[in-house]
Swiss-Prot record:
Organism of this sequence: Rickettsia rickettsii (strain Sheila Smith)
Keyword annotations of the record: Cell cycle, Cell division, GTP-binding, Magnesium, Metal-binding, Nucleotide-binding, Septation
Sequence positions that bind Mg(2+): S53, T75
Record flagged with keyword Chaperone: no
Binding site for GTP: 46-53, 73-77, 91-94, 158-161, 189-191
Protein name: Probable GTP-binding protein EngB
InterPro entries: G_ENGB_dom, GTP-bd, GTP-bd_ribosome_bio_YsxC, P-loop_NTPase
Keyword Transferase attributed: no
Domain of life: Bacteria
Any one Gene Ontology molecular-function term assigned to this protein's record: metal ion binding
Family: Belongs to the TRAFAC class TrmE-Era-EngA-EngB-Septin-like GTPase superfamily. EngB GTPase family.
Cofactors (names): Mg(2+)
Length: 212
């Protein structure tokens, strides 16, 4: 089992795509509110407070694009951002711990699951993992859901500046992917140092075959 390494090229350099300005276009708090865009969609999913919104702001070069909070569970809807009519970036609510009633957690679970199962234009899912915590049971369940629905995904270890050795994370990811019999990109990103941002942009541009 090996992971693919993203090497930005002239045709897939994400900086060309992400030099455009992204804007918020829709929010969905239930499945009936999920819009149907005619553009490719790329989603970001992970546990509460893993850094989804911050990462979206980093790659879009706009710290105010997606609302960021230090309190887990504050993203309570699916947020959709349009990047220059080339791509829809999807910020999903965090799963796992959230200081909200069980009924609300269940509602989020239904919303996330429905979107991942049914989005016609979904091209890639970025499964975000906190580098300090490693891969947890909820992350494994999401990966199983993605594979069951033939969704392509890549693993993004966030807050990479908080750990000094990536080898253990790499080994953990390799072992995890081996159990799934799946191969994908594994990246390390930091919103503070911007580590991995260029490679992530390149992978997204490559996914939608952006070349101009």
């Amino acid at each position: 089992m090996t992971t693919q390494k993203i090497v930005p090229t002239k045709s897939t350099d994400g900086s060309k795509l992400f030099r455009h300005q992204a804007k918020f276009v829709a929010g969905a708090m239930n499945i009936n509110q999920i819009p149907n865009f005619s553009l490719p969609e790329i989603a970001f999913v992970g546990k509460s407070n893993v850094g989804k919104s911050s990462l979206i702001n980093t790659i879009c070069n706009n710290k105010n694009l997606a609302k960021v909070s230090n309190t887990a569970g504050r993203t309570r809807q699916i947020n959709f951002f349009n990047l220059a009519d080339k791509l829809i970036i999807v910020d999903l609510p965090g799963y796992g711990f959230a200081n909200v009633p069980i009924s609300v957690k269940e509602q989020w679970g239904v919303l996330i699951s429905y979107y991942l199962r049914n989005s016609y234009n979904l091209r890639l899912v970025n499964l975000l993992i906190d580098s300090r915590r490693g891969i947890k049971e909820n992350d494994k369940k999401v990966a199983d859901l993605l594979l069951a629905n033939k969704r392509e995904f890549q693993i993004i270890f966030t807050k990479s500046d908080k750990v000094t050795d990536h080898k253990n994370l790499h080994d953990e990811a390799q072992n995890f992917l081996a159990t799934l019999n799946y191969s994908c990109n594994v990246m390390y990103v930091s919103n503070r140092s911007k580590e991995g941002a260029r490679e992530l942009k390149a992978s997204l541009a490559k996914c939608i075959k952006f070349q101009k």
